[in-house]
Amino acid sequence: MDYIFDKFTEWIKNLLVDGIMNNLSGLFDNVNAKVSEISTQIGSTPQAWNGNIFNMIKNLSDNVILPIAGVILALVMTLDLIQLITDRNNLHDVDTWMFFKWIFKTACAVLVVSHTWDLVMGVFDVAQNVISRSSGIINGTLNIDIASHFADLETRLQAMGIGELLGLWLQSFIVGITMWALSICIFIIAYGRMIEIYLVTSVAPIPMSTMVNREWGQMGQNYLRSLFALGFQGFLIMVCIAIYAVLVQNMIVDTNVSTAIWSCMGYTVLLCFTLFKTGSLAKSVFNAH
């Protein structure tokens, strides 16, 4: 009877050890892949990230939004002319210079609207240049490999009791599900930012058509601030990833396997939290809303 019980105990222990090793071997693979992917994607301009989407958005902007922006521009400049004339003592003090001033403002407004796409892409080209230069300064591995810190991990697991192994297997399983969810969060941040860029750029002519007007100009100015916030959000993401890389490189793994698993996951949770904060931080820096 003792022989049968020992064999059953050994079988359960081997099953738990194999399960723990399998859970730990690929525990951080998805997160490592997503972190490497996001560090590459944030350095891409809208046209380089996906050419098909870029062309579609540009066609929509040129063929659908630009005519609407032209109507808004005509309305804004007409109101501006009326205000310019009535401000001069109700037409009793009209001078010809004000018409030249209005013609100059209108010409500038038409120039801005007709070159909106170039101006918008210029903002992201500047941001991409900043990110590329920062990536040359920031170095370091972004990968977490928990198994590499425990060369004798399987031997140590074999020395544990069934209760300890069962608890460790349950922890590794829970952490594995959590890491899968975190990898999805990183994916959402990377792709969500690029989709937001495409959405914002698609309507660019409308806010840009209000730039030269005193009352309506706040719309265009806030739009430009939003563009810079979106562009430089990539730089903040790069800084977050750099801090994450330093933490991973200097990670002191505890001799306790359970503590090591949770500490590694803690770094990844911290990364996700800071990545989600980059959008609001960039908007607050550029006073965009």
For the regions a language model picked out, list residue spans one by one.
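Gly/Ser-rich, low-complexity
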Residues: 1-72, 88-97, 107-178, 217, ...
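Membrane-water interface regions at transmembrane-helix termini and the short interhelical loops
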Residues: 81-94, 183-187, 214-216
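Alpha-helical transmembrane segments of helical membrane proteins, especially in multi-pass transport
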Residues: 175, 179-211, 225-247
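Hydrophobic alpha-helical transmembrane segments
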Residues: 67-79, 197
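Membrane-embedded alpha-helices of multi-pass transport/permease systems
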Residues: 75, 120, 124-127, 185-188, ...
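Hydrophobic alpha-helical transmembrane segments of multipass integral membrane proteins
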Residues: 74-78, 180, 201, 274
